[in-house]
Amino acid sequence: MAKQIKFSEEARRAMLRGVDKLADAVKVTLGPKGRNVVLEKKFGSPLITNDGVTIAKEIELEDPFENMGAKLVAEVASKTNDIAGDGTTTATVLAQAMIREGLKNVAAGANPMGIRRGIEKAVAVAVEELKAISKPIKGKESIAQVAAISAADEEVGQLIAEAMERVGNDGVITLEESKGFTTELDVVEGMQFDRGYVSPYMITDTEKMEAVLENPYILITDKKVSSIQELLPVLEQVVQQGRPLLIIAEDVEGEALATLVVNKLRGTFNAVAVKAPGFGDRRKAMLEDIAILTGGEVISEELGRELKSTTIASLGRAAKVVVTKETTTIVEGAGDSERIKARINQIRAQLEETTSEFDREKLQERLAKLAGGVAVIKVGAATETELKERKLRIEDALNSTRAAVEEGIVAGGGTALMNIYNKVAAIEAEGDEATGVKIVLRAIEEPVRQIAQNAGLEGSIIVERLKNEKPGIGFNAATGEWVDMIEAGIVDPTKVTRSALQNAASVAAMVLTTEAVVADKPEENKGNNNMPDMGGMM
């Protein structure tokens, strides 16, 4: 296929047009008075959203050179979303400002490489200063503030704060679509895995169709159990203690299953069997997790352990176990807290090393189950369109909150970037490097300017006043007042602000140092579209 090439100023201008088209569509959503954008969907109703990355991903421009510019800025939003989970609109606004200011200077004869070095120097100082003014997040109230700002909804803020309080910072919080109109929180405390009882005769509560074991022993093995002879020694010891037994095995079948069911029905003793969760190596790891959580051991022939020689000392214990048709939940395992902590740290180390998204998800689940539990936020709304929009907002809020817990918070509403303005301005640089620093200074004014414009105010006036205010004081666009941003609960996660700035600078530097752009030549339609006369045919 033939290619078309544009060089230097012509190439950069074409890309800038694409950058502007995408950024102008995204930046109308910034701030408390930001508007929505409606996205056409090939199937189903249109999607209404104010999520920067969702809008950026939808934009495809006809001109291939403009499209390249748009795609580069979409990459800024996407990368920021991957790292911090929020701040995609801020990143887009920063990137547009840096590219626009940079191209003006390149057109005036500045050296792009010098500008690039200046941008990198300024961003490095800005990131250090953001870390210096960052405050650690404390308590449920702070978490609720971060979530409420991101979702623009106080009720959502409270829900997320409660979820994080219940399952801990490492807990898994998932979003599901609710059948009703309201958004509510459902928390599963303890460790839950998706395997239920192997026989319905094992249930203890016929109304709820579940087996509830109070203070049970837990036998954990990776073997298939079919002979009752293997289980007899340990069963006799458990019966003497007068406590129920949960058996987690690859499978329980045949004579062993029949004996357990008959004794349960006769009331001799209460035992429930469930299949081991997961497959292959993941199954071994999950069984080991359960063993550590409950203070038991995995009975495995690989480790030289046999079922018939198992004693009560090798069994795990828990305050309560609830087994349904599809799930098993272990509450308050009796494991040693130091061993559980060590296991959590081991999984965290694996999380940092893994490159697979699937493995990361599974490790995160295991971590959550050991650390506290799983919370499900069931998102409700009156219409499907509202439901999708609300779910996206809550997802952003959740990511934002996690980022805040990780790296702390700074004043929101673009104020934090303005608070570090003077430190960046004090960087010693000469020539084109100094120009690069000035480009970053102009860009860090842009979020405040845009938030003010979206609120129907003159951005430049707000920016100038902010430069002279003492640190932490900012403009609350929702009320039109000047307040202490952190006290007023208007905060941004440091990680979100930092990632937005770093990713915007990275892509801006790439665009400024572009000297040629190559794209496919559009194919002309050679076919003759005029249909021949049908000659009077019916």
UniProtKB/Swiss-Prot annotation:
EC top class, as a word: isomerase
Protein family membership: Belongs to the chaperonin (HSP60) family.
One GO CC term on file: cytoplasm
Keywords: ATP-binding, Chaperone, Cytoplasm, Isomerase, Nucleotide-binding
Gene Ontology BP annotations: protein refolding
Entry EC number(s): 5.6.1.7
Function field: Together with its co-chaperonin GroES, plays an essential role in assisting protein folding. The GroEL-GroES system forms a nano-cage that allows encapsulation of the non-native substrate proteins and provides a physical environment optimized to promote and accelerate protein folding.
Stored CDD domains: GroEL (cd03344)
Pfam families per record: Cpn60_TCP1
Entry binding sites for ATP: 29-32, 86-90, 413, 476-478, 492
Protein name from the UniProt record: Chaperonin GroEL
GO molecular function: ATP binding; ATP-dependent protein folding chaperone; isomerase activity; unfolded protein binding
NCBIfam families reported for this sequence: GroEL (TIGR02348), PRK00013.1 (NF000592), PRK12849.1 (NF009487), PRK12850.1 (NF009488), PRK12851.1 (NF009489)
Species name: Geobacillus kaustophilus (strain HTA426)
Subunit relationships: Forms a cylinder of 14 subunits composed of two heptameric rings stacked back-to-back. Interacts with the co-chaperonin GroES.
Reactions that this protein is recorded to catalyse: ATP + H2O + a folded polypeptide = ADP + phosphate + an unfolded polypeptide
Cellular compartment(s): Cytoplasm
